[in-house]
Structure formats: structure tokens, C-alpha cells
Amino acid sequence: MAGAKEIRSKIASVQNTQKITKAMEMVAASKMRKSQDRMAASRPYAETMRKVIGHLANGNLEYKHPYLEERDVKRVGYLVVSTDRGLCGGLNINLFKKLLADMKAWSDKGVQCELAMIGSKGVSFFNSVGGNVVAQVTGMGDNPSLSELIGPVKVMLQAYDEGRLDKLYIVSNKFINTMSQVPTITQLLPLPASEDDDLKRTAWDYLYEPDPKALLDTLLRRYVESQVYQGVVENLASEQAARMVAMKAATDNGGSLIKELQLVYNKARQASITQELTEIVSGAAAV
């Protein structure tokens, strides 16, 4: 059994770690609330844009934009949203597992995959497993802006425009609540027809200014950008929630470990006292 001094040192070490994890839990909780506010603020725009685009996809347009047309699939692209920091449980690895399974399904059909990464954890993971990473952006912090995301989005849209990609997806974690974040893969291009029954029942007539091509070129690009930005802010809220839960679990585990070490310490101290008493009694008997 370890000595009492060594056990006291372990207890102090765990207590110090527990203070750190508790502080990180509180910081993550604060950041999560701010991220939720940002996510809630951007959702109405993203949802409205999705509805408008859904009407376009279901409508009979006089100009058929390339983003609305299905192609024979030879190459697919993924915009992958991960975190820049760790200590957030299985948030990233669950997302990567889902993406790898989807990529394997395409690969089995002879389809090649390209990746544009948002977040350093995704960059390091897919570089290590040999993923074809064609664009990346990292270090966006806790308040990302749309301008920071333009690089990877532009690369993938250009590849799609030039026919080097036939499908484009966004891969991110969808924030459900503090305890639940779901990895999702959502098709961006070609624009999928909406499954919303209300959209199917309602037919819109369109008046274009200045002309259909100019309008749709701008509108559909804004749609892709808005969905990517929404994916990033939802992933950020998911990250902070997962980190808060992970740090709370670490703090609770630290408390359990301290109790166990305290019990071991008490036993060691009791054994030491018993040994000292035995030595005193033995010495007195010898006299």
C-alpha cells in the first residue's frame, strides 16, 4: 500500500485538476449560452432562405440553374465543420465516423470524395487518414463571421461550377439541446426538392428582376453560404454543450476519485498508527 504522504499528494493533485475542470465547465456554460443566442439569431434567416429555395426547387422555372439539375455522380464534395479545440467528448469523432461511413458508401460505387475543412480537428484527422483535403480554415474563435468561411465555400462552389464535383454536402453537428448533439450530413447541391407538404401544395409565380440567371446565381450562392454559416454556429453551440458536459463528468469523477483516495489514506494512516502502537507495546514489554 502506498504511504500516507504519497496518497496526500495524489489527493492534492486530483483536487487541483478538479478546480480546473470546474472552471472549464463554467466557462463552457457561459459560451454555450452566447452560442445559442447566435444560433437562434441566424436560424430565421437560414430557415426562410431554405423555404424560398425549396419553392424554387419544386417550381417550374423558365431558367434552369445548374445548381438545380441532377448529374451523374463521379465526384462528391463535403464541407466538414469540426472544432478547433478538444475536450468536448465524442463530438468530433462521432461526426468523423458518420462521414467516413458515407464516404465509404460512395467509394464502393467508384465515386471520389473531396473535403473542405472548417476547424483544425477535422484537418488533422483527415490528413492523418489520407483524406483528400482541398481547402481549410481554422482558428475562427468563438464568434465566427461569414467572411471567414468564404474561402472553403468558394473553392467547393468553383469546383461544382467547373464540373469537378457533382454533389456537395455540409457535415456538422446539429444542436438539439444541452445533452444531445446529432452529427448530420445535408445535401447542398444540387438543390434537393423540398419534402415539406406545404411547399408542395403552394405554387408560387415568379417575377425576376433584373433577369432569372443573375438573380438565381446570387440567390443560390447566398443559400449555400447561409447553410454553411448556420452549420458552423450550430456546431459551435454543440461544442460548448459537449465540453460543459464532459467537464462536469470529469469534475464528478474527480470527486469520486478523491473519496476513494481518502479511504485509502485513512486505511494507510490507521495501519501506521497500529504499527507504532505495536512497537511501543513491544518495547515496553521488553523492558
From Swiss-Prot:
<keyword id="KW-0375">Hydrogen ion transport</keyword>
<dbReference type="InterPro" id="IPR023632">
    <property type="entry name" value="ATP_synth_F1_gsu_CS"/>
</dbReference>
<keyword id="KW-0813">Transport</keyword>
<dbReference type="GO" id="GO:0042777">
    <property type="term" value="P:proton motive force-driven plasma membrane ATP synthesis"/>
</dbReference>
<dbReference type="GO" id="GO:0045259">
    <property type="term" value="C:proton-transporting ATP synthase complex"/>
</dbReference>
<dbReference type="Pfam" id="PF00231">
    <property type="entry name" value="ATP-synt"/>
</dbReference>
<comment type="subunit">
    <text>F-type ATPases have 2 components, CF(1) - the catalytic core - and CF(0) - the membrane proton channel. CF(1) has five subunits: alpha(3), beta(3), gamma(1), delta(1), epsilon(1). CF(0) has three main subunits: a, b and c.</text>
</comment>
<dbReference type="InterPro" id="IPR000131">
    <property type="entry name" value="ATP_synth_F1_gsu"/>
</dbReference>
<keyword id="KW-0066">ATP synthesis</keyword>
<keyword id="KW-0997">Cell inner membrane</keyword>
<dbReference type="InterPro" id="IPR035968">
    <property type="entry name" value="ATP_synth_F1_ATPase_gsu"/>
</dbReference>
<keyword id="KW-0139">CF(1)</keyword>
<dbReference type="GO" id="GO:0046933">
    <property type="term" value="F:proton-transporting ATP synthase activity, rotational mechanism"/>
</dbReference>
<keyword id="KW-0472">Membrane</keyword>
<dbReference type="GO" id="GO:0005524">
    <property type="term" value="F:ATP binding"/>
</dbReference>
<dbReference type="GO" id="GO:0005886">
    <property type="term" value="C:plasma membrane"/>
</dbReference>
<keyword id="KW-1003">Cell membrane</keyword>
<keyword id="KW-0406">Ion transport</keyword>
<protein>
    <recommendedName>
        <fullName>ATP synthase gamma chain</fullName>
    </recommendedName>
</protein>
<comment type="function">
    <text>Produces ATP from ADP in the presence of a proton gradient across the membrane. The gamma chain is believed to be important in regulating ATPase activity and the flow of protons through the CF(0) complex.</text>
</comment>
<comment type="similarity">
    <text>Belongs to the ATPase gamma chain family.</text>
</comment>
